[in-house]
Amino acid sequence: MVQSLKLKKILVTGSSSRFCKYLKEDLKHYNVFFTSKKNFNILDFKKMEKFLKNKKIDYLIHIAGLSRPMSIHEKNIGLSIDLNIIGTANIVKACNNKNIKIIFFSSNYVYPGKKGNYSET
């Protein structure tokens, strides 16, 4: 399986994230494109879909989003909704349209830091 992935084109969103710093090292022997919001804006659906088509992406690892949405959410709810909800929905829709497999990453920062009625799996 790992050998067959070396033949696939993989796109990773959120390349400036702390997590991607480590992922870049782990995936250096694969055909991976690390994108940033400059060249792959998850809020611009048409450009994003064109990029995916032109690069002929097989897999998309979605990491882009706000790393601490709860603190930013209070200051700018629009930005939080745009990046973490609308942007992710755009990724899912574009990948679905192009038959691209998605791997989605998130962190514990999606929780407000208070004990609540939720669990992690």
Listing of model-derived features with the role each one plays in the protein:
Residues 81-88, 103:
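Short alpha-helix in the Rossmann-fold core of NAD(P)-dependent oxidoreductases
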